């Protein structure tokens, strides 16, 4: 069983720069057809300072943590039994190419179902920009199958 004493545990914050080339690649890979995601002139015409961050791109940047497996390692979770359970995004402000975003992760909850056959770890991540403005809150649920 996962140790519930880790609920509330925070990981070291880390920062990542939003790069234009990666935004364009992500927009193309996810089928974004609005030119504001790939053409800087179109973005400026639309009133943006630069290319806007497409939906869900923050998950990619979150994976740039110095140790993306830190929470799983901390809890001793076996990779062979992990499933991606759920993911959600709450946006508070837009982010753009050139921004430096800071990610602060915390274990928000640990619980089980089916008599412990399934254990769930809820991670919440606050994302803020270089002006310390809250950009988004990410919620990820990882499921561990036991037995």
What positions do the PLM features span?
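HotDog/MaoC-like acyl-thioester-processing domains
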Residues: 1-2, 91-147
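Hot-dog-fold acyl-thioester-processing enzymes
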Residues: 1-84
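Short alpha-helix capping/helix-loop boundary micro-motifs
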Residues: 86-90
